[in-house]
């Protein structure tokens, strides 16, 4: 079976095609520092034979043989001032149905600044020893919100057409490649279908995938849903396994 055959993402060689998606473990300390439990969790996964592990934090060693990718993201409107200490931001001043606050629309200058910060974050991940980074553009977070007509109502160069809505993600990927090198693998995670009225559908997602590939993404990681369709992101036990695999195909 191909799933057990070696695979290559850019110059990163994987021993098989089995990948652990980034998942919140709550194993880190309250201030975000990795704990021994968190490290052991990922080491055991690597020893189990996974080809690539995508972690939600920055503290893993490669001694068990697997490759490790750091997922980087910005919550955007899917958070609250109670957590961040400031008003959430988004592509538009449009409230997420699951959140208590309306975000502030980002200025173009703020967008440019954040693009640089994503690139700097990826550079630090590379310097820390990560084999790759995953740019998280799924589930309605800031990057995903820019790409989606469900949350992006802008009328400037970052809104409207799918190319304009993808511009933020593309500029982030380009900035990462500029700072980390063309050979450094960049994965892009996206929700192929958002399952909300007016959200991303498969035809636009096909275009989005090609655009981020054009910008330099080496791998597309397909998920589905946004916070307003959480039942799709975290399906209940009655949902058949691999129910959304056709979206990725």
List each language-model region with its residue ranges.
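Flavin-dependent oxidoreductase catalytic cores
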Residues: 1-249
